[in-house]
Each structure stands twice: as C-alpha cells, then as structure tokens.
Amino acid sequence: MKITDIRLLPLTGATADGGWDQGFDEQENLHTLVEVVSDEGVTGLGSVYTSSKLCEGALGILRPMALGESAIEPARVCEKLHQSTFWQGRGGAITHLISGIDIAMWDLFGKVTDQPVSRLLGGRYRESIKPYGSLLMTEPDVLRARLEDAVARGFRAIKMGWGPFGRVSRELDEEIVSTARETVGADVELMVDAGGSDRYWPHGYKWALTTSQMLCDYGITWFEEPLRPDDLAGYCKLTEHARLPITSCEVLTRRQAFQPWIEQRAVDYIQPDVTKVGGLSEEFRIAMHAYDHSILFVPHGWNTAVGLAADLQLVAAVPTARWVEYITPAPYIEDLVLGDPFALDDKGHLDIPIGPGLGLDWNPEGIERFSGMQLTPSDV
C-alpha cells in the first residue's frame, strides 16, 4: 500500500472561547488538517498547529520524498523525512508538517489493521482519562462565568492560561486565582499557565518562584510556562525549589530538543504538542524517555478534534499518563466529529476511543464548513 497524495485542509472561521491573546481572529488560519491518501483507497487524517501557507511551503519539499512510500510504516517514513531535511526548515514548518503526516499515517495504519493507534504503539494502559478543560484567563468577573460553564459541562480539572496573568500586577494575579478557587470549589483541580512563550515575556526566576508560592496557597496542581521557553537553566533552578510541579516545553520540536530538559530534570511534567513536535512517532519516544526519568508526560493540546484524538491514543499507551488537554469550548473539536465522543462521564473522565486508527468518525460537513474542502472518500 503506497502513498499517492497528501492534501492540506486549512481551518478558518473559529477560535477558542475568548479568542486569541496575540491578536488573531476567526479569519486567521492557525490549524491545518492533513490527509494522506493511499493507492488502495484508504485515507488517514492528521492535524498541524501551523498555518496552511507554511504547510504548503513544507509540502513542496516533503511531497516528493513521501509519494510512493509505504502508507503503513509511519515511524520509518517520517524518520526518513526528518533525516532528509536537516537543511530545510528543521524544527520549524517542516517538522510541523511531518507531525500531521505522521498522525495521518498512524490513523491509516490503524484502519488497515483494524486496531486503535494506542495498541499499535504497544498497548493500552487505560480506557479513560481525566481531561482538563483549558480556557483563557480574563478579569475575575468574566472568568467566573467561564469556570462555572466548564464545571457544568463535567470538567473536574481546569487550566487557566495567559490573559492578564503576570502582565498587570501581583494583586490581580492573586485575585484571579482566588476567584477561580472560590468558583470551582476544593474538589476541582486547578492549573495555572502563565504563558511564558508569549511575546516579550518580562519575568524571570524570582517572579516565578514568588508566584509559585502564592499558587500553593490555593492548591494549584501545576504552574505552566512561568519562564521563557528557552530558559533551561532557569527551569532547572525553579523546578528544584518550587513547592508545586513546574511544566513546560510545548514549543519545542523533535525528540532531540527534549533530551536536555528531561535528562537535567528541568521540569516535573513535560508537555510536547503532537501537532508540531513530529507527530505520534516522535511524541511517543519523548514520552517514554520522560517516563524513564520519572517525569510525567502531559500532552499539550491547544488544537483540533484530530489532535485531541491523537493525544488520547498517546495517553492510553504511556504508563503514567494522568491528564489530557481539552480546549473548551472549541468548534474545531466538537464540530469536526460525528456523535458525542468527547462527552465526560460522571467522574469527569473521557473514554479513549477503541476503534481503528484514531478511533473517531469525522464530520464531513463540519470539516467542509471550516476548510471549504471535502475529505477524500475512504474505503475503510
């Protein structure tokens, strides 16, 4: 079974609730679906956290290398793509697009073998997992309503990120956290994401350590991206001295970039993003390397239904996974699938799909509405 085509389906027309911090709007294309088509009529679907214009440029490089390759050997084929592009955007748009191709190939491989990706990765350690509802921070009064809605939807873990946190005053930071804890109560886990990968992040180690101490007073589960994303030394020091877990690494790509962060214990929890790190093949290797060093794997997932489906297969296959990220609400998640596969149970858990490939049935009307394109009919 050979690869005969790779198609890009750019998504526009929606954002996560609250919009984007960096000025993007509904007409911006930040997510691109990737479809891999085989000569036997079976297709797979992937997702990339990158604009279609960058993906188009990368596809011009990668397509000639991928066409004619086996459609059911994702790890080997995508390693070939990595190895063949050291001088062509390594770590950037090239790696991002390889992520989407890899996810799509695993989806296709699962369909051909009639197995979920998690089983093909080595086996399933769990059949469900706790999602944390991921939402943007804002002023306390508005935030309160968003939190109430997330709890009403069944979330028992919620992460608040970016917005004014760390950008106005320490007093406002604590008011936001205090309001959040008061709103959700003691039984809902709360995580805080400072968004240190934002433009011109102003804070360093001392701010992060002092803020982490304040967060401990409110029972915060972890403190995410309190420093700039390349501050390895700062993270090592902060992780050693903070009383709560420190998390980061969502902007890194390729397994090699994660090695010093894992081996130097720069974070307590590591957060690769499957839609840009290199796909399922690469992220699984990162997760298991972290596991060998007693660092918890928590996939970053500010993405689409396809990305969330890939994350669910990953957390099923990693021994110590405890959470998966779920943007809420998000049309690129709920509107791209048929049925209600992301419904939470009474414990606030998501079932991990057991069907072939990524395990979900895509909504062709939803995909066409946001991309203006149709999926290729698949024989499986």
Model region roles, listed by residue range:
Residues 93, 102-142:
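Glycine-rich, aromatic-flanked loop segments that form ligand/cofactor-binding clefts
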Residues 22-27, 152:
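Short Gly/Pro-enriched turn/cap motifs at secondary-structure boundaries
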